[in-house]
């Protein structure tokens, strides 16, 4: 019935700041930048007078994986606040990225001002084996995760 995941959409308050973070801090590559408005945009979003900008980014290391879709609603303006302030809330809680060296990536991102929940933690996960994981926030408070398999 369903095919592969097409993209992961994240609504942001400040597109330029979000693009800087995902492109310049995390190292994703911009694939496209579009503006959407009109009746179709109003219908699909169930809002009136929609004008939104979408920027698509993807890791150059995983050309088959789904891109990240950053959405900025120019009109109507989005609500203030942070998404899912607690991981225990229902809904999509995080976007995870595989990395080769989690400790080095953690150190590099901290040096760039990225705020983390904690240092990387080691888990035994059925189907994956040993995995190191750590959560952090993007500029809008969306939770992101780094993962590394450990032998």
Place the predicted regions along the sequence by residue.
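Vicinal oxygen chelate
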Residues: 1, 10, 33, 68, ...
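Short, solvent-exposed beta-strand edge segments and adjacent coil->beta transition regions
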Residues: 3-7, 52, 90-94, 131
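Core segments of cupin and vicinal oxygen chelate
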Residues: 11-65, 104, 126-129, 135
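A cross-kingdom feature marking solvent-exposed beta-strand/loop segments within repeated
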Residues: 38-41, 78-81, 122
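Generic beta-structure capping elements
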Residues: 60, 71-75, 149
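Short, flexible, mixed-charge acidic loops at enzyme active sites
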Residues: 73-76, 82-83, 117
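Non-DNA-binding regulatory cores of transcription-related proteins
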Residues: 85-88
């Amino acid at each position: 019935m369903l095919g592969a995941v097409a993209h992961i959409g994240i609504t942001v308050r400040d597109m330029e700041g979000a693009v800087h973070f995902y492109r310049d801090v995390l190292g994703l590559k911009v694939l496209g930048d579009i503006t959407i408005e009109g009746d179709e945009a109003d219908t699909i979003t169930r809002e009136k007078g929609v004008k939104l900008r979408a920027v698509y980014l993807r890791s150059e290391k995983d050309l088959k994986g789904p891109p990240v879709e950053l959405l900025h609603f120019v009109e109507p303006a989005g609500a203030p606040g942070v998404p899912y302030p607690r991981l225990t809330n229902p809904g999509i809680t995080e976007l995870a990225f595989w990395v080769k060296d989690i400790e080095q990536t953690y150190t590099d991102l901290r040096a760039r001002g990225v705020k983390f929940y904690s240092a990387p933690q080691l888990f035994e996960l059925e189907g994956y084996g040993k995995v190191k994981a750590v959560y952090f926030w993007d500029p809008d408070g969306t939770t992101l995760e780094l993962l590394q398999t450990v032998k």
